[in-house]
């Protein structure tokens, strides 16, 4: 994956995030763009989807702790500064467009820390910080749309909700010529992402050799 292949577009001031969002066909899909009042819904669907995720279980330990983390990320970063979609049958995504810099607020970080102290397992905050550092080390420098999370409720599984969440955005990225990046935290999902054009960039352990692995994946835009 070339790190600087798309730098000329940014130098010309092209707003890829707006281009992609304009091309997403929400009218013929079941998706709805989340607004600021939807942060808890986005987070709680995501928390339910990742409750048994190997990486999140290793880092945070409990479903309540995992949900607490996603509430901070949805409220402070992805709903106000990124792009989040909701599916009526119980699905949600959190995306970040290229060139957008966002971080949790100080209050959000305090709420996260408090949530981990109350609900998490010992060492959860440190493990979370270490994972964040490793994710940053692997994160590509080349501009891209970043898929932070995609997930469904337990009741929505097996109904094609995941594909319905992903395909409209990938189609829009193809139309705008924008690559996509994600980190797969569950080996069971590798085939799903591969079927949508993602290729593995590598793999890294969350902590030591016996810890779960993350699988960074990259998708080049497909020609029309």
Predicted regions and their residues:
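Conserved active-site alpha-helix within GNAT-family acetyltransferase domains
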Residues: 163, 175, 186-203
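Conserved acetyl-CoA-binding loop-helix of GNAT-fold acetyltransferases
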Residues: 158-171
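Conserved acyl-donor/pantetheine-binding loop and adjacent beta-alpha core of acyl/acetyltransferases
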Residues: 92-151, 157, 208-209
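A short helix-loop-beta-strand connector motif used in the catalytic cores of GNAT acetyltransferases and
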Residues: 68-91, 140-146
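N-terminal amphipathic/basic-hydrophobic helices that include classical n-h-c signal peptides
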Residues: 1-21
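Conserved GNAT-fold acetyl-CoA-binding loop/helix
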Residues: 51-72
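A short beta-loop-alpha structural element at the N-terminal edge
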Residues: 30-44
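C-terminal "cap" of GNAT-fold acetyltransferases
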Residues: 178, 182-187, 206-224
